[in-house]
Amino acid sequence: MDNQFIFKYSWETLPKKWVKKMERSEHGNRFDTNTDYLFQLLCFLKLHTYTRVQVLIDICGVDYPSRKRRFEVVYNLLSTRYNSRIRVQTSADEVTRISSVVSLFPSAGWWEREVWDMFGVSFINHPDLRRILTDYGFEGHPLRKDFPLSGYVEVRYDDPEKRVVSEPIEMTQEFRYFDFASPWEQRSDG
């Protein structure tokens, strides 16, 4: 069995409402699904005889601010039995919650926490959804495209006080001169 068989079999077997779009390539299969059917689709891929996905390699997020459902959540899966890679993608906005897959793949707990911490995508029924990479008092989600590059606060160690200090960052500038003339144009002074 190969990617082509798994693709054809999945296309013929899966309910059409579970999958918005399917693509096949030599590197693996891709399924686009709605957040409402994500858990059912992953359950099918894990438990069905002709797919047998045993490994959740990674869950990652992508921010597309121009889209209505701006966050893309990507599940990278591996079937060691059939030597096949499968990528499942779903989209969410700021308020849409995605079903947690920790009950199917226990390792998903860490990756769902990372996606929540970095992008703010929330997962329903996650046993411990809290920050994993940023500090507990951190405000915002740093991998969103609208998050400022310098952040909102500066965190530094103050040696005289022997403690960590958080200070708001001043982002405004009092004066800035822009020279709009091109350096390649010849100036004629007279």
Curated annotation (Swiss-Prot):
GO cellular component: mitochondrial inner membrane; respiratory chain complex I
Database matches in PROSITE patterns: COMPLEX1_30K (PS00542)
Alphabetized Pfam families for the sequence: Complex1_30kDa
GO molecular function ontology, one term from the record: NADH dehydrogenase (ubiquinone) activity
Catalysed reactions, as listed in the record: a ubiquinone + NADH + 5 H(+)(in) = a ubiquinol + NAD(+) + 4 H(+)(out)
Similarity remark: Belongs to the complex I 30 kDa subunit family.
Protein name: NADH dehydrogenase [ubiquinone] iron-sulfur protein 3
Organism: Arabidopsis thaliana
